[in-house]
């Protein structure tokens, strides 16, 4: 029993330390609490395909309908050549939230987040920025946005 408790204690300590290390998530919006998701859970979203170069930003607008309570966003790309992208989420009011690869504990070319939507932020446009942080020439990506 002691060994199981010790193993669990070490696991929790590592989880807390790993979660605190690195600034992959910068949520400056006190109203929205984003949850990191480790699977590609957005099969019903119509994907948006794009290409981005180093220092370039692609902008997307998404209308969140009235009555929606949840927002899910997924950004995926190929990291085999070391390309790094960043996702910025701009709600209709308040500060934006910034997300980078590795939030789920793995550098895998995937940023996937979910948040509850306050009723005051529905029936409005949200903006999503895909930023080429470190890109060798050009990298292709897929962006999926769902609200329900």
Residue ranges and their predicted role:
Residues 2, 8, 18-20, 37-38, ...:
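Intrinsically disordered, low-complexity segments enriched in Ser/Pro/Gly/Ala and basic residues
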Residues 86-148:
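Noncatalytic accessory or regulatory domains flanking protease catalytic cores in secreted, cell-surface
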Residues 5, 11, 21-23, 40, ...:
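Serine/proline-rich low-complexity intrinsically disordered segments, especially terminal tails, linkers
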Residues 51-102, 122-124:
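Acidic, Ser/Thr/Pro-rich low-complexity intrinsically disordered segments
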Residues 1-28, 128:
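Secretory targeting signatures
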Residues 22-70, 146-148:
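Non-catalytic extracellular/lumenal accessory regions of secreted precursors
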């Amino acid at each position: 029993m002691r060994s199981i408790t010790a193993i669990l204690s070490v696991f929790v300590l590592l989880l807390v330390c790993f979660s605190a290390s690195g600034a992959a998530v910068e949520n400056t919006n006190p109203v929205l609490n984003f949850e990191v998701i480790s699977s590609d859970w957005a099969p019903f979203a119509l994907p948006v395909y794009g290409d981005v170069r180093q220092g370039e930003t692609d902008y997307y607008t998404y209308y969140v309908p009235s009555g929606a309570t949840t927002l899910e966003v997924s950004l995926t790309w190929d990291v085999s050549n070391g390309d790094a992208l960043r996702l910025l989420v701009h709600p209709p009011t308040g500060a934006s939230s910034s997300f980078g690869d590795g939030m789920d504990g793995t550098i895998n070319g995937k940023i996937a987040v979910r948040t509850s939507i306050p009723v005051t932020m529905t029936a409005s446009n949200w903006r999503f920025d895909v930023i080429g942080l470190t890109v060798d020439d050009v990298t292709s990506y897929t962006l999926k946005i769902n609200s329900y």
